[in-house]
Structure formats: structure tokens, C-alpha cells
Design a protein with these regions (language model features):
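Short, well-ordered alpha-helical segments enriched in acidic and aromatic residues
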Residues: 67-79, 185
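Short beta-strand edge/turn micro-motifs at domain boundaries
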Residues: 113-116, 120-157, 161-164, 288-292
Length: 319
């Protein structure tokens, strides 16, 4: 099996910065810079108020048809410069603009109004709400919270897919003698040493068979983020080389006489808890993925996970 999986390749290319002694310092350093607080995306002036929700909707439609990103930011109460510089802002704006031309539906929800856009009725994150004085405006903070929540969900779905791909990549790796030592073994590292095939990933220009993690990435920007220790889709990863007492068979190392032949594992945890993800995931050779919410101490707890050992607080991820 060959996995041409960009996600798995990205987490592996970033792994050189996440293994061993470099991990703790880098985690603490980048956690402070991953995302500013939601308030920093808000404009100094609040979003404009309207006498009726219909007026607010017409203002939204007019702004979108005019193609002015700054005016949309003002209508939603956002800092235009910071909103425009965020990842995917231009593409998202174009998609919303196109969707508004297809269809725009107004739905009542929780005492306010939600704009559903396009044929797929994508809900605009910023709801229309009524103030105590009877005026209507787009709720900036609620919209930013919703965007963050949606991103968490998307990141977690992507991470589960990547973890599944990791299991397949390890089995692929062990199907051949990759390092020429006469032993069929699993990879103890995500990224191979220079000129070697001792990890799940090696660059295609190195020659020989394609690595189990797939070809080198075309998306250089995403690759650089992974290399900088920013993770992939909000998550960091580490190979686990043993299992604990909560697992059938008890405590033992997967590495025997220097070769990882007794199994393999992986842990994936959010770069910034509550912002890029909530759940932490672990998997072993069985392919059954477990998840747990480790709370505000997620980074500290995940740094110490070296063995596959899900306990009572861990649940099996549903298919």
C-alpha cells in the first residue's frame, strides 16, 4: 500500500522539531504565538446597528456585491487588516461572495437571525442579534467564537484521518527491510535520517522507493509551518514505542534488540488547547483510535506520553 497522503507527510516533516529535547522549549515558544485572543480581531468600533434585521441583511448583500473586503469587515465589527491577513481569508471571502449570488436565506435561531449562504446553505458564523434598545447588529464576538469552534472540529476530523493513515504507513514500512539490517520492523521515527530510510518519510529526490508517508509536498507554505513546529492542522504528533498496563498484554516495549517489532503507537495533541483542538488522540497497531479531553494541562500531559496506555478517561473514536 502506498499512501500519497499530504497530511501524514506534513506531520512527519515537522517531527524533527518535535522529538527529543527540543520538544518542550518549542511547544512553549510557539503556543504563545499560534493565535491572538479573539478580541484582537475585533475593530475598535462596534459593528453598525440597524432598525430592522432586513436592513442589516440588505447592507450585507450590498457589501458583498460591491466586493470590498474592508466594508464587510466593518459591517461585521472586525479589524480589517487582521482579518485579511488571517489564513484563507481571501479564498473564504470569494466563496461567500459567490454563495450570496446563488442564495441567501434568513433563519431564526436562539432569538436572533442567521444568514445561510449558497445552495449548500452555509451558515454565516456572525449572527444578527437584537440589542436591549431594539437595534440589530452582527455579533462580532459570537462570530469569532463560532469560527474557532468550527476550526476545532475540522482540525480534529483531519487529525483522526491522519492518525489512521499513520497506521497504514507503519504496516507499509514493515513490509520491507527499509534499513538493510535484515529485520522487518516498524519505524521508530517519523522522519528519516539524512540519506537513510529509518523513518516513515524520506524525500523523493533521495531516490529509491517512495516513502510510506507519500511524496514530498507541493504546498511549501504548509511544509514550512510544519518544520517551524506549528504542527499540521493544529496538531502535533509523536511515535510511541511501548504500551502501558491499561492495555491487553500489560507493560512492554515495542523495541526489542534495537528494532521496533512488537508494535507501534502514536499520540496527537492540539498545538493550543481550545483554539486549534480539544481532544488528544492515541492509536496502536490495532488501528483503534482513542480520544480524551485532557483539559488546560493538555500540552504538559501530552509531553509526558511515551507509551500507548489509554485509561478510563479515554473513549474509542467512532467511525
Amino acid at each position: 500500500m502506498r499512501l500519497a497522503n499530504e497530511g501524514l507527510t506534513l506531520i512527519i516533516c515537522g517531527a524533527v522539531f518535535l522529538n527529543g529535547t527540543l520538544l518542550s522549549g518549542l511547544v512553549l515558544a510557539v503556543d504563545q504565538d499560534v493565535d491572538p485572543p479573539l478580541e484582537e480581531y475585533m475593530a475598535a468600533q462596534r459593528s453598525p446597528e440597524f432598525d430592522t434585521p432586513e436592513q442589516a441583511v440588505e447592507a450585507f448583500k450590498s457589501t458583498m456585491s460591491g466586493g470590498d473586503f474592508n466594508k464587510l469587515a466593518q459591517l461585521l465589527g472586525l479589524d480589517a487588516h487582521k482579518a485579511k491577513s488571517s489564513d484563507g481569508a481571501t479564498d473564504n471571502y470569494a466563496a461567500i461572495q459567490s454563495g450570496v449570488k446563488e442564495k441567501l436565506v434568513i433563519e431564526d435561531r436562539d432569538g436572533g437571525k442567521v444568514l445561510e449562504i449558497g445552495n449548500q446553505l452555509w451558515p454565516l458564523p456572525f449572527p444578527l442579534v437584537k440589542s436591549q434598545d431594539g437595534k440589530w447588529a452582527f455579533d462580532t464576538y459570537a462570530g469569532l467564537e463560532e469560527i474557532a469552534n468550527r476550526r476545532v472540529g475540522e482540525n480534529e476530523i483531519s487529525t483522526v484521518d491522519t492518525v489512521r493513515d499513520y497506521v497504514g504507513a507503519q504496516e507499509d514500512y514493515a513490509s520491507e527491510d527499509r534499513d538493510g539490517d535484515g529485520v522487518l520492523e516498524y519505524a521508530q521515527k517519523l522522519i528519516s535520517s539524512d540519506g537513510q530510510h529509518d523513518g516513515l518519510y524520506w524525500p523523493s529526490e533521495q531516490g529509491g522507493d517512495e516513502s510510506p508517508a507519500g511524496p514530498a509536498l507541493v504546498d511549501g507554505n504548509a511544509l514550512e509551518k510544519a518544520k517551524a513546529g506549528l504542527g499540521y492542522n493544529g496538531y502535533r504528533y509523536r511515535v510511541l514505542t511501548g504500551q502501558g498496563g491499561n492495555v491487553a498484554g500489560g507493560i512492554y516495549d515495542y523495541i526489542i534488540n534495537g528494532n521496533m517489532i512488537a508494535g507501534f503507537g502514536l499520540v496527537a495533541w492540539p498545538v493550543k488547547y481550545g483554539i486549534t483542538g480539544v481532544k488528544t488522540f492515541v492509536v496502536n497497531k490495532s488501528g483503534i483510535i482513542y480520544e480524551a479531553d485532557l483539559g488546560d494541562d493538555t500540552t504538559m500531559v501530552a509531553e509526558k506520553i511515551r507509551a500507548f496506555n489509554p485509561g478510563d478517561k479515554w473513549d474509542i473514536v467512532s467511525e
